[in-house]
Regions:
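Bacterial Sec-dependent N-terminal signal peptides
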Residues: 1-29, 39, 427, 442-443
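Bacterial Sec-pathway N-terminal export signals of envelope proteins
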Residues: 19-68, 72, 78, 228, ...
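Small/polar, glycine/serine/threonine/aspartate-rich low-complexity segments that form flexible
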Residues: 21-24, 70-111, 237-245, 291-324
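Periplasmic alpha-helical coiled-coil/stalk elements that build and connect Gram-negative outer-membrane
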Residues: 30, 54, 142-257, 371
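Sec/SRP-type N-terminal targeting helices
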Residues: 43-47, 60-61, 113-140, 190, ...
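Short segments within alpha-helical structural elements
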Residues: 61, 204-226, 382-440
Length: 443
C-alpha cells in the first residue's frame, strides 16, 4: 500500500513538473521574439527564400556545361540484306553487311555560348530572390502586429472579466440590501427588480467574455506559432503596456516612402515587368551553342562486349550550332508590345503606391494621436463615473434618489469602464499600425 501511495505521489509530482514546463510565461516583447522564430507565416516565408535561392542556382546552371552519357545496344534478329552484282553476271546477289550485334557508348558536353534570354533570366531569378526576401520582411512586420493585437485582446478580456466581477460583487451587495429594505417596506418593488435586471445583464456579459477568453488565448497561440491549446501566462499588464506605447515623438517622425517595404515591393514588381520586356526583346537575338562528343563502338556476331579482348573503336566530334530567328509573323512584336504595356501599368502602380503610403502614414499618425487623447479622456471619465455612481448609490440607500438615477449612474460607469479598456487597446494597436506604416523595423 505504501508503494502504491509513493507511486501516485511521484506520478503527480512529475505531472506537475511537466505541466509547468508546458506553460509559457511571456511579456509582449518575448511573445514577439518567439513568434518571429516560430510562427507559421515566418517559417513559410523563410522557405520561400530558400526556394528562390535554389531557383537562382537552377537558372545559373543553364549557362554552365551540361554533360550527358548514352549507352546503346542493338541485336539484329534478322539482318537486312543488300543486293549487288558483284560478279557482273547481270544478276543481283544478296549480301549481309556488318555484324549481328553492336554496342556504342558516348559522352556529350553541351555549352551555351550566347543566349540573350539566359542573361535576362538570370537577372529575373535574382529579382525573384529579392522579392522573396522583401515578402519575408513584410511577413515579419505583419506577424509582429498580429501578436501585439492578439496579446492586447487577451489582456482586454482579462481586464473586462475583472471589472465585471467587481461590478457584479458590488451590485449583488446592493441587490441584497435593497431586497431587505423592500421587505421592511422602505422602498418599492421596482427598485429591486431594476437591480435584478442590471445584475442579470452583467452576469450574461461575464459569461460571454469568459467564453471568449479561451478563444483569445488560442488566437494568440496561433499568431505565435504554438499549438492553440498551449498554456501561456502573460506577464505584462494592459495599463503598463499602454503607458509604454505612448510615444509622441513617433507622431513627428519623418516618413521616407523609399524605405517602406511596400514601395520596395512595388519597385521590384516594376523591375520584373521591365525584365519581361527585355526577355521578349532578347528572343529576337541569335543563340549560339557548342558541343563536344566522345564515343566508342564495338561490333560482334555474339555478345562479347564485356570480354577483355573485344575491340572498341573510338570517335570524337566537336561542333557549333547557331540559331537565328528570322520571321515570327509579328508574334514577337505583339509580345514585346504587351510587355511594354505591363511595364507602363507597373509605373502607374508605383506612383499610386507612393501616394497611398504617404496618405497611410498621415492617417495612422492621426489615428494614433486620437487614441492617446481618447485614452487620457477615458481614464479621467472612468474616475468621474465611479464617483458619480458612488454618490448615487449613497443617495439611493438614503432614500433621496430613485432607482432610475442609480441605474443611469451604473450604466454610465459600465460604459466608461469598457471605453477605458478599449482605449488602452487602441493605443497599443494603433502604435503597432503606425510603426508598420512608417516601416520601423522590429527590434
Amino acid at each position: 500500500m505504501k508503494k502504491l501511495i509513493l507511486v501516485c505521489i511521484s506520478t503527480c509530482f512529475f505531472a506537475t513538473i511537466y505541466a509547468q514546463e508546458k506553460t509559457q510565461q511571456l511579456s509582449l516583447k518575448e511573445a514577439i521574439t518567439y513568434a518571429l522564430k516560430n510562427s507559421y507565416g515566418v517559417k513559410a516565408a523563410q522557405n520561400d527564400i530558400l526556394l528562390a535561392q535554389k531557383k537562382v542556382w537552377e537558372t545559373t546552371t543553364i549557362g554552365l556545361p551540361q554533360i550527358t552519357g548514352a549507352l546503346g545496344y542493338q541485336n539484329f534478329l534478322q539482318q537486312p540484306v543488300t543486293l549487288a552484282d558483284f560478279d557482273q553476271d547481270g544478276t543481283d546477289d544478296p549480301f549481309v553487311f556488318g555484324t549481328k550485334q553492336n554496342m556504342n557508348a558516348s559522352v556529350t558536353m553541351n555549352q551555351l555560348l550566347f543566349d540573350g534570354s539566359y542573361i535576362v533570366g538570370l537577372q529575373a531569378a535574382k529579382t525573384y530572390l529579392k522579392i522573396s526576401e522583401q515578402a519575408t520582411e513584410k511577413t515579419v512586420m505583419r506577424t509582429k502586429e498580429a501578436v501585439i493585437n492578439a496579446y492586447g485582446n487577451v489582456l482586454v478580456t482579462e481586464n473586462s472579466i475583472l471589472v465585471l466581477e467587481g461590478n457584479i460583487e458590488v451590485l449583488q451587495q446592493n441587490y441584497t440590501a435593497t431586497k431587505e429594505i423592500y421587505k421592511n417596506g422602505f422602498n418599492e418593488e421596482e427598485d429591486v427588480e431594476q437591480l435584478e435586471i442590471t445584475l442579470g445583464n452583467l452576469k450574461n456579459q461575464l459569461n460571454s467574455i469568459s467564453r471568449m477568453k479561451s478563444i483569445a488565448y488560442q488566437m494568440l497561440n496561433l499568431a505565435m506559432g504554438n499549438e492553440i491549446d498551449t498554456k501561456i501566462i502573460l506577464t505584462d499588464t494592459l495599463d503598463s503596456l499602454t503607458k509604454a506605447n505612448i510615444s509622441l515623438a513617433l507622431i513627428s517622425q519623418d516618413f521616407k516612402v523609399s524605405n517602406h517595404i511596400d514601395f520596395k515591393i512595388s519597385e521590384n514588381d516594376r523591375e520584373t515587368k521591365r525584365l519581361m520586356m527585355r526577355l521578349e526583346q532578347s528572343k529576337g537575338l541569335p543563340t549560339l551553342t557548342a558541343f563536344l562528343n566522345f564515343g566508342a563502338q564495338a561490333n560482334s556476331d555474339s555478345f562479347t562486349f564485356l570480354n577483355g579482348n573485344q575491340r572498341w573503336y573510338d570517335s570524337s566530334l566537336l561542333g557549333v550550332n547557331l540559331s537565328i530567328p528570322i520571321f515570327t509573323s509579328f508574334g514577337g512584336a505583339a509580345k514585346i508590345a504587351q510587355a511594354k504595356i505591363a511595364l507602363d501599368t507597373a509605373d502607374l502602380r508605383l506612383i499610386e503606391t507612393k501616394q497611398r503610403l504617404s496618405l497611410q502614414a498621415q492617417k495612422t499618425k492621426n489615428d494614433y494621436q486620437v487614441s492617446i487623447e481618447n485614452y487620457q479622456t477615458s481614464k479621467k471619465n472612468v474616475h468621474l463615473a465611479e464617483r458619480i455612481e458612488k454618490k448615487q448609490r449613497v443617495k439611493f440607500f438614503e432614500g433621496i434618489s430613485s432607482s432610475f438615477d442609480l441605474l443611469q449612474a451604473q450604466n454610465q460607469l459600465y460604459t466608461q469602464q469598457q471605453n477605458y479598456i478599449q482605449s488602452m487597446l487602441a493605443v497599443i494597436a494603433n502604435k503597432a499600425t503606425l510603426e508598420n506604416a512608417l516601416n520601423i523595423p522590429t527590434k
